[in-house]
Amino acid sequence: ITLGIIGIVAAITLPNLIANHKKQIIETRLAKFYSTVNQAITQSEVINGDKKYWFDDLGGAQIGEDGKPIEGSSEAQKWFNSYLAPYMQITKEEIDSSGRLIIYFPDGSAVKTRFSDGSREWIFYPEKPNNCSEATSNFGKCAFLFMYYPAKAPHGNGTENSDFKYHIGKGFEPFKWHWDGEATSLYDGCKERFSYTIEHAYCTALIQHNGWKIPKDYPIKL
């Protein structure tokens, strides 16, 4: 009977313990990445001047005839290594099969350019990227969207209109493109989508808005 009771208690409590541990990893590593990358930007500005002058929206590696990325051809990687890498602790860099840059950190997290033809949107992974599929349904679960767009880039196709008002002049920020400034919109844009955004695009911003803690009413099951 005693063993049976222990088994029942374990079956009830273990999933909660696992879920709470996962939440803690997400919260801690999101906050750490946000702090670390923006400190790196501040340090880089001391040497390179205002970030709006050295930011650029650059593409990833070119793909060769053999279908593999051409080593050394990623403009995004060259930019990152010039302006941010010297001020961050990095364990390794990779180029994925589509030419996108992936940066790995000592705590097991990583960040990757979302697109192969631009470097203003980034996906942060609290844990191994290989364990999190590319589907947008994973945004807010194991992948979290950021944008770095302090100014209109020389090589980008963006603007400085009101859609970017929560990014222009700032560092790496949770994705807030087209946000109307309302807290309820962050919730809606995390649960499904808000206006023109992709699904779950605002989950990172929702967590930031709650002091880098996952809200009790977080709309996505982790």
Specify the residue positions occupied by each region the protein language model found.
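Intrinsically disordered, low-complexity regions enriched in Pro/Ser/Thr/Gly and acidic residues
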Residues: 67-222
